[in-house]
Every structure is written in structure tokens, then in C-alpha cells.
Amino acid sequence: MSRLALAMVLPLALPFAASAGTLKLYTSQPNEDAQKTVDAFQAAHPDVTVEWVRDGTTQLMARMAAETEAGVPTPDILLIADTVTLEGMAQEGQLAAYQSPEAENYDPALYSDQGYYYSTKLITTGIVYHTGAGAVPSSWADLAGADYKGMVAMPSPLYSGAALIHLATLTTNDDLGWDYYQALADNDTRAEGGNGAVFKAVASGEKPYGVLVDYMALRARAEGSPVEFVFPDEGLTYVTEPVAIMADAPNRADAEKFVDFVLSEAGQELVVEMGYIPARNGVDSPEGFPARDSLKLMEFDAARTLADTEANKTRFSEVFGVQ
């Protein structure tokens, strides 16, 4: 890391060389969600003070690298976008193994069996369409059909982490695979930007169909936007905003309390209040969302996705002719 990069990061980092008894959280949650999470945890544990930093996952990883090089203490806890990032950190020995007693309420696919990270919500990816669209898709395969040629927008896996996980999941599915992505490209599917750009294109009618994370479409529909959302027949890809404890967490005891809280029934009810599908079994989804136990989640391997990331990006660039 350059001296310039360190100089830019350290003024932000030094205030968080926290005093004993505080819990330091780094999160990629939206600011409002992060504040609600911290407030609820501190209400349940009034003896713990939480200091938190919010940024994108990539930016947080860069910040921690700079802080490590500068000798600044790491955060105690991470609550970030996806399991692939945390799988990489686990493989590098950066995360602590913690067997939360709350894990018994979660599907094994939603947490590290060694206790390195735990999913806290389900943000699924499905199909959004404009209410003025002619056909209503029911499957991922539909989007590659002639009726949808030039009419579909999707986020680019070169830009969006959720889109990269979506690609990794579908391309390892026996019924879809890379042939499906080639068919999308041949069907003049537009792949660029993130989920926000896709939603804007569909809601405005520029593109009748899109590949999108669930909450953007369902919240907008509830507010009167002319969109509908489909949970495809083949199943859903998903990201889970997992929580993890750093291996050298200065405040390990309170970090464990934080993990247990966000996984608890109360913590998951908070997830519902924020407008997301809970990861915990037995907790009702928000109004307008499907029941948690009705979701068909596609098989996903975080370790394989991590290993295949660069190859997947390269192949996607070749298939879609983008950089």
C-alpha cells in the first residue's frame, strides 16, 4: 500500500483505535439499517458501546488492509454483503471460528460449518418486469427466448457482487450453465452497471424485463411503481449479508454477543422490519414478500465461487464482449 493511500486512510482509522469495552463494527449495510442494528443490539446489551464504520465491501477490505499495514487494531466484527468475501478471509486465517448456539435455527447452507460466518438475511435475485410488458416470464430460461430478444437488462458481474454470485450459481447449474449466458448474449441482453440501473430501466419502460434483487422491486411495487416480480421456476440465487468475527478481535466476548443477537429471533425480526427476508427459519417474511419456507434457493458454493471468480469474470467479458 502506498504512503498516499495510508495517509488517506489513517485519519479515518485512528478514532477507531477504540478504548477497552467498546465493540468496533465494519458494515456495508445502508446507514439507516446499520444504525437500527446498532441501536437494537445496544438496547439488548446496554453495557456494550458500538462504534461503527459504514462503506462498500470493497472499500472496507481496502481500509482494513491499510490499517493492518499501519498497525491499527482491526474491527471486532464484520457485517458485509456476501459470503464469498468472507470465505476468502476465512481461508487466509483472518476470521475467528465461533459456534453460535443460534445456528440450529438456520439451514446449514447459510453458514460456515466451522463457524467463520453466518448469513443474516436473504436477498434473492429474480425477474422484474414492467406491468406494460407483453409476456410474463416464469423462468430464467424464458429470458433467453425469442420473445425477449433485446428486451432484458441485467447487472454486470464485473460491477455487482450479487450479479457475480448470480453468474456463479447459474453457470454451475446443470440445466443452465454457460450455454445459458451465451444464449442471453445472443439474445441482445444488456449487461451493465448494478441493480439500481436495472430497476431504473425497467420502471421507466426502457427495458420491459430485468434481473434484479427482490427488495428493490417489491418495495417499489408497494409504493406504486409499475413493476412486478417473479421468483423463477428453477430457483433463486441469493446474497446473505453475513456476520463474522475477526481472528484478532480485541473484544471477542462482545463480538460473540453481537453474532448471537443478529441471529436471534429478535435480530431476525429486525431484519423483517427493515424489509428483508429473514435467514432464520420460523420467522415470517415482510408483508408482500413470499414466506421464507416457500423459497427455492439454488445450490451455491462460496468456496468454489471464490476460486472461480477471475475466470468467471474473464469468460463473461468474452461472452458479452465487454470489459
Regions found by a protein language model. Give the residues of each.
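Short, polar/charged alpha-helical segment
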Residues: 24, 28-51, 65, 220
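Extracytoplasmic ligand-binding site segments that recognize negatively charged/polar headgroups
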Residues: 28-35, 57-58, 73-206
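A ligand-binding cleft/hinge motif common to bilobed small-molecule-binding domains
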Residues: 84-88, 208-226, 275
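Short beta-strand->loop
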Residues: 96-102, 115-119, 141, 209, ...
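Periplasmic-binding protein-like
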Residues: 123-124, 181-185, 191-192, 223-249, ...
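Mature extracytoplasmic/periplasmic domains
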Residues: 246-301
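Extracellular/periplasmic bilobal clamshell ligand-binding domains
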Residues: 288-323
